[in-house]
Amino acid sequence: MSELWVGPAQSSDLVAVAAIYDHWPRTSTATLDVMQPPLSWWQAKLDSTDAGDHFLVVRDDDAVLGFAYSGAFRTRPAYALTRETSVYLARQAMGRGAGSRLYSELLWLLRHDRVHLVVAVVAQPNPTSNAMHRALGFTEVGTLDEVGLKFGSYVSTTWRRLRLS
C-alpha cells in the first residue's frame, strides 16, 4: 500500500470519479441522487473557475480512490463567501484516512480563497461522515427530517458548518 496523494482533479480523472460516484446513487442513501450524473456534469464542475470552487482527487499509485469538491452554496451574490462541500470515496479507500486528507486539503484551499463559511449536508444515518466532519471542526446546525425519499424510505439530512474566518 503506497502513500496517498491529494491534488487537483484533471479531465483524465473524470471517468474514475464517475465510477466511484456511481456506486452511491445505486446502493446508498449517502447521496440523494438516484441516478449517475453524465460525464459532462463532472466536466462542468472541473471547469468552474469561480472563487472557492475546487475539485480534488486522492490517489494511491495511479488509481483515483476518491474525490472532493466545493461549489456555490446558493447562487445569490450575498452567499459568495459560503461554499458547500462534498467528499466521496471508493469502498477500498475507506478507513485509510483518505477522506480526511481530501477534506483537509480542500479546507486549506478554501481558507486561501478567504471563504468565510463551509456547509456540508450529510444524509442520515452516516456515522462515518458525521465523525469525520466533527473531527475536522464542523458543528451541527440542524436536521431536515424526512426531506428526501429514496429506496422507499424517507431520508433526513444533517446540516453542518465550519467557520473559516
What is each stretch, according to the model?
Residues 34-92, 103-104, 109, 163-164:
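Acetyl-CoA-dependent GNAT
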Residues 94, 120-130:
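Conserved beta-strand-loop-alpha-helix junction that forms the acyl-donor binding cleft
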Residues 4-19:
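A short beta-loop-alpha structural element at the N-terminal edge
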Residues 95-109, 130-135:
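Conserved acetyl-CoA-binding loop-helix of GNAT-fold acetyltransferases
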Residues 19-36:
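Helix-loop element at the rim of GNAT/NAT acetyltransferase active sites that forms part
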Residues 69, 77, 119-122, 134, ...:
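Conserved catalytic-core motifs of GNAT/GCN5-like acyltransferases
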Residues 110-122:
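Conserved GNAT acetyl-CoA-binding A-motif
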